[in-house]
């Protein structure tokens, strides 16, 4: 019984040896460490697998009905202050442990091949293992101080990995942007922690919740101050989980390697904010205004993220805005008190989004030898299309992740999102309408990404990458500004140098990736006489596909752990059993179940909205659009005059909103960043001219006084003695007449 619990403190330290040994190896014996660099990937996977075994054992005990376990070590104790460190094992901890270790293992296996060409391979694995260790430490923390320490470590690792390719100016700027934005949230979190300690006198979660509840129920607390502290705590979660308005760092974070994008969006950085809200849920639930504020931020983020994803060309940024929107759903669920649905969607979204990001990495990996290693080209969906026959396994798994995020049964996200939608309707019809509408938008933009990537023809061979001005041959927006004409290759061929010189599809400005780069014979276009041989994408290697396929299985089956169907014979709802200790703390005698009729009616409505979004995306981007266009149905619609012009204006507004990131970055740049820079310049000028002027003036004055005395003295000792005695005499006279 609970034999694993006393040793659970080991879990956060299990991945650390790789970070320490790689760091020491690169400092002491760099050449020997680099020669065995691929070995560190195996060790990383092995150690994290050991952590997974611990996590599975703990989770089985939690599902079996084990109680909450906490162990503390006293750090410092006196009469007025005590600080303890330890670990807390409950259902929330066990869920997060499983999530971090499973996704982390898949990312490690995937990264071994994905990063094999990079000179920073060892540095990447050192950061990655430290990232996993920090997140494991965060979810097992037993008090707010411990959480804050690991919170900062998680942030530090994310900054290092976002700016991993720091020689790229865009990556360096993205790292800086993530750091500055999260500083705002982290400062709020620190103030909130100090405020809660002022109220309760404790950092430990159990004591803090108990004391806070007593104070609220007895009305012996200033509710405004308590709400302010809770808001500051939530500010940390807003920044970490990329909620409005501190979401601006998330799209730029795509400058990091794709495996890191998968880990950040699935199980670490953005999940940390959700975890904090879930951990402090017993505190927030006593403050109704804070719960409403959480739900409001969530619903705004749901809609904003979906609208910003509509017109993105970068495949990773499209997925980033999707993450922002889905995390908004989770925050909405937390705010309306649907604790179970929030954690359920956290689980299902994590596996689906990890699958999509690793799938996008496989796509990027296949496109890089053709278009070059610039993210502007290898991640650009304009240059993709028709990849189904080149990367069939990636296509199948990517489709699974897309359908899951769209909310199509029986895939994972269908079960959790449907539960959030139903609960939101009970809480607020307005919130429910926005949530249901965004579900349709989610289906639209996700299927848009899928169709632009895999449907149609490979557009790279019909696109001019050499900088010559030419009309685009394929429309990638829904606004109908340009028509597709993939059959006419004369436009492309006319751009080729008439002297029959070799034409490369590489960008003229490429990024050096080191001596480990793969040498692929089919990575460029060559002329053989008058015939052009085009390169084509290729399927990823087996280790990358293994991770993608395993995550595909999770996406297929993980939703079944939370099926809310209990007819008295078989209870499929493993998640409720898993969460029983935590749910009982929040709601006494709580039991979650839904009958068949209600469940089916709600599911039909939500799936219909998702299918409508998929239909619109297929009509505008898929083969259906081409078929209708050949029948001139679109052209007949275009002749409707004023109605068509009005519709185009609306679509252009939506397009510009999405393409310009909702103008939020622009507003921050104009009114916040610029003013802060001016204030910094003003304070710098004040410091340089006044503060430094006083300090330097004293030094300069002393110098000139010394020089004057030097010339007066002339170097004779008798003169020095005369001046010295004169000063002493004057001093004694002054003392005698004015003091005595």
UniProtKB/Swiss-Prot annotation:
Q: One Pfam family for this entry, by name? A: Proton_antipo_N
Q: How does it sit in the membrane?
A: Multi-pass membrane protein
- The protein depicted here goes by the name NAD(P)H-quinone oxidoreductase subunit 5, chloroplastic
Its lineage opens with: Eukaryota, Viridiplantae, Streptophyta, Embryophyta, Tracheophyta
Which Gene Ontology cellular component annotation is one that this UniProt entry carries? chloroplast thylakoid membrane
Membrane spanning stretches = 9-29, 40-60, 89-109, 125-145, 147-167, 185-205, 219-239, 258-278, 290-310, 327-347, 354-374, 396-416, 425-445, 521-538, 545-565, 599-619, 720-740
User: For this protein, what is the EC number?
Assistant: 7.1.1.-
Signal peptide residues are none
- State the family it belongs to: Belongs to the complex I subunit 5 family.
Q: Does the keyword Transport apply?
A: yes
Q: Name one GO biological process term.
A: electron transport coupled proton transport
Describe, as the record does, how this protein assembles with itself and its partners.
NDH is composed of at least 16 different subunits, 5 of which are encoded in the nucleus.
Species in which this protein is naturally found: Piper cenocladum
Main location per the UniProt record: plastid
GO molecular function terms attached to this record: NADH dehydrogenase (ubiquinone) activity; quinone binding
State the UniProt keywords alphabetically: Chloroplast, Membrane, NAD, NADP, Plastid, Plastoquinone, Quinone, Thylakoid, Translocase, Transmembrane, Transmembrane helix, Transport
Does the UniProt entry include the keyword NADP?
yes
Q: Which reaction does it catalyse?
A: a plastoquinone + NADH + (n+1) H(+)(in) = a plastoquinol + NAD(+) + n H(+)(out); a plastoquinone + NADPH + (n+1) H(+)(in) = a plastoquinol + NADP(+) + n H(+)(out)
Function recorded in the entry: NDH shuttles electrons from NAD(P)H:plastoquinone, via FMN and iron-sulfur (Fe-S) centers, to quinones in the photosynthetic chain and possibly in a chloroplast respiratory chain. The immediate electron acceptor for the enzyme in this species is believed to be plastoquinone. Couples the redox reaction to proton translocation, and thus conserves the redox energy in a proton gradient.
The UniProt gene name for this protein comes to ndhF
Q: Where in the cell is it found?
A: Plastid, Chloroplast thylakoid membrane
Gene3D superfamilies in UniProt: 1.20.5.2700
């Amino acid at each position: 019984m609970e034999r694993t619990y006393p040793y659970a403190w080991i879990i956060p330290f299990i991945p650390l040896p790789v970070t320490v040994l790689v760091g020491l190896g690169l400092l002491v014996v760099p050449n020997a460490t680099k020669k065995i660099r691929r070995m560190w990937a195996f060790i990383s996977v092995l150690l994290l697998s050991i952590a997974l075994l611990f996590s599975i054992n703990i989770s089985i005990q939690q599902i079996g009905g084990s109680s909450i376990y906490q162990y503390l070590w006293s750090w410092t104790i006196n009469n007025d202050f005590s600080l303890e460190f330890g670990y807390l094992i409950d259902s929330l901890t066990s869920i997060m442990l499983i999530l971090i270790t499973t996704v982390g293992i898949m990312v490690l296996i995937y990264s071994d091949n994905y990063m094999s060409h990079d000179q920073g391979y060892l540095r990447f694995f050192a950061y990655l293992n430290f990232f996993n260790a920090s997140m494991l430490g965060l979810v097992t923390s037993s008090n707010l101080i411990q959480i804050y320490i690991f919170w900062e470590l998680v942030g530090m690792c994310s900054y290092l990995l976002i700016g991993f390719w720091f020689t790229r100016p865009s990556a360096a700027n993205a790292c800086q942007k993530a750091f500055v934005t999260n500083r705002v949230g982290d400062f709020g979190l620190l103030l909130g922690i100090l405020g809660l300690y002022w109220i309760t006198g404790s950092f430990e979660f159990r004591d803090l919740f108990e004391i806070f509840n007593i104070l609220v129920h007895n009305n012996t607390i200033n509710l405004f101050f308590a709400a302010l502290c809770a808001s500051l705590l939530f500010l940390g979660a807003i920044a970490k989980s990329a909620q409005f308005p501190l979401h601006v760092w998330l799209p730029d974070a795509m400058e990091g390697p794709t495996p890191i994008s998968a880990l950040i969006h699935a199980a670490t950085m953005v999940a940390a904010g959700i975890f904090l809200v879930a951990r402090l849920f017993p505190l927030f639930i006593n403050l109704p205004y804070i719960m409403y504020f959480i739900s409001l931020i969530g619903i705004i983020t749901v809609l904003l993220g979906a609208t910003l994803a509509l017109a993105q060309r970068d495949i990773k940024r499209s997925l980033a805005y999707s993450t922002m929107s889905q995390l908004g759903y989770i925050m909405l669920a937390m705010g309306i008190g649907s604790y179970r649905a929030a954690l359920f969607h956290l689980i299902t979204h994590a596996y689906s989004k990890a699958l999509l990001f690793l799938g996008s990495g496989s796509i990027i990996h296949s496109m890089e030898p053709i278009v070059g290693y610039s993210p502007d080209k290898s991640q650009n969906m304009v240059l993709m299309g028709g990849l189904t026959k080149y990367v069939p396994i990636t296509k199948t798994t990517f489709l699974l992740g897309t359908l899951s995020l769209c909310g199509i049964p029986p895939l994972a996200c269908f079960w959790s999102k449907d539960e959030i939608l139903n609960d939101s309707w009970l809480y607020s019809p307005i919130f429910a309408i926005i949530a249901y509408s965004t579900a349709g938008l989610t289906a639209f933009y996700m299927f848009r990404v899928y169709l632009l990537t895999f449907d149609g023809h490979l557009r790279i061979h019909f696109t001019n990458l050499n900088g010559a001005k030419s009309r685009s041959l394929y429309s990638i927006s829904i606004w109908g500004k340009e028509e597709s004409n993939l059959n006419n290759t004369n436009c492309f061929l006319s751009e080729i140098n008439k002297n029959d010189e070799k034409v490369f599809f590489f960008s003229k400005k490429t990024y050096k990736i080191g001596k480990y780069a793969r040498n692929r014979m089919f990575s460029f276009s060559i002329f053989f006489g008058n015939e052009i041989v085009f390169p084509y994408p290729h399927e990823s290697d087996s280790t990358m596909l293994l991770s993608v396929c395993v995550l595909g299985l999770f996406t297929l089956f993980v939703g079944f752990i939370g099926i809310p169907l209990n007819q008295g014979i078989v209870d499929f709802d493993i998640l409720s059993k898993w969460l029983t200790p935590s749910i009982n703390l929040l709601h006494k005698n709580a039991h979650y179940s839904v009958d068949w009729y209600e469940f089916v009616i709600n599911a039909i409505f939500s799936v219909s909205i998702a299918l409508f979004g998929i239909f619109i995306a297929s009509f505008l981007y898929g083969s259906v659009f081409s078929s209708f266009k050949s029948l001139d149905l679109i052209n007949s619609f275009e002749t409707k005059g004023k109605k068509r012009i009005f519709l185009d204006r609306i679509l252009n507004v939506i397009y510009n909103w999405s393409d310009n990131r909702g103008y939020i970055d622009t507003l921050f740049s104009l009114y916040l960043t610029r003013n802060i820079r001016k204030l910094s310049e003003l304070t710098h000028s004040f410091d340089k001219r006044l503060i430094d002027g006083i300090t330097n003036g004293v030094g300069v004055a002393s110098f000139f006084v010394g020089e004057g005395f030097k010339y007066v003295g002339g170097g004779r000792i008798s003169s020095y003695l005369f001046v010295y005695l004169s000063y002493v005499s004057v001093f004694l006279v002054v003392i005698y007449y004015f003091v005595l």
